[in-house]
């Protein structure tokens, strides 16, 4: 029996030693693993510190070389045939007026005629239609003038009262202004923005006592076109002003460089 007790004590001692060894192994493994994570984090931190991120700006003032002027005219009549005849008369008057002002015929585009029926309606206290009586037709036609003679079309759009006084019910919209060489302009601005970004990166590296390395990444920002000398807001999705003849275009380039 005494021998049995001694054997049990020896077993407990051996088990305690095994447990202690297992504990040491687990702790050692945890230390090794945490050391690996810390080293890796340090490595990544140094990697991030070896990168310069800069944003360059390209900006250009320009003047539109294309104008688009939209307008419309209407005629009302109880008889559809009479309404068409009156609208045709106004269309010819408008076309002849534009030609007399020096607008080329190929620059004038008339849309198809829109027709709507007119009714005289009465309503109850709940705004439901109580009765309606047909009163005639309203015919509408749009006309668009697109030209590179910007100033000429501008002046004509301001003189439409001459047509209105002659009986043509013309509704004139504000002209829209465009630039036909926008693609070329955009390429030049990208080059300018890239150059500006690189100069900024070189200056930052110089101030840090380092040298600029290879380009890691480049990303074009939003392209904006706004009116010159205006308080027009920039948009995250990009602005494209068409109401002003004189415009300013802006674009940004985001570059990431290695430093050494």
Predicted regions and their residues:
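Short, Lys/Arg-enriched N-terminal segments with co-localized hydrophobic residues
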Residues: 1-14
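Short, charge-dense linear interaction motifs
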Residues: 12-260
């Amino acid at each position: 029996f005494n021998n049995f007790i001694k054997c049990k004590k020896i077993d407990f001692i051996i088990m305690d030693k095994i447990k202690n060894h297992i504990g040491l192994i687990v702790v050692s493994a945890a230390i090794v693993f945490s050391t690996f994570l810390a080293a890796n984090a340090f490595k990544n931190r140094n990697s991030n510190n070896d990168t310069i991120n800069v944003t360059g700006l390209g900006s250009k003032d320009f003047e539109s070389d294309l104008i688009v002027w939209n307008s419309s005219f209407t005629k009302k009549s109880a008889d559809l045939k009479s309404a068409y005849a009156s609208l045709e008369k106004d269309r010819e008057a408008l076309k002849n007026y534009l030609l007399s002002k020096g607008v080329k015929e190929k620059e004038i585009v008339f849309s198809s005629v829109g027709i709507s029926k007119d009714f005289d309606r009465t309503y109850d206290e709940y705004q439901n239609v109580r009765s309606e009586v047909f009163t005639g037709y309203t015919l509408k036609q749009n006309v668009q003038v697109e030209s590179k003679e910007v100033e000429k079309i501008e002046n004509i759009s301001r003189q439409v009262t001459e047509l209105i006084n002659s009986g043509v019910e013309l509704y004139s919209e504000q002209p829209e202004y465009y630039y036909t060489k926008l693609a070329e302009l955009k390429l030049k601005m990208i080059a300018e923005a890239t150059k500006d970004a690189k100069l900024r990166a070189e200056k930052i590296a110089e101030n840090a006592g380092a040298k600029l390395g290879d380009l890691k990444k480049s990303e074009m920002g939003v392209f904006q076109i706004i009116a010159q000398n205006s308080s027009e807001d920039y948009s995250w999705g990009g602005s494209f002003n068409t109401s002003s003849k004189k415009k300013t275009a802006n674009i940004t380039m985001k570059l990431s460089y290695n430093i050494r």
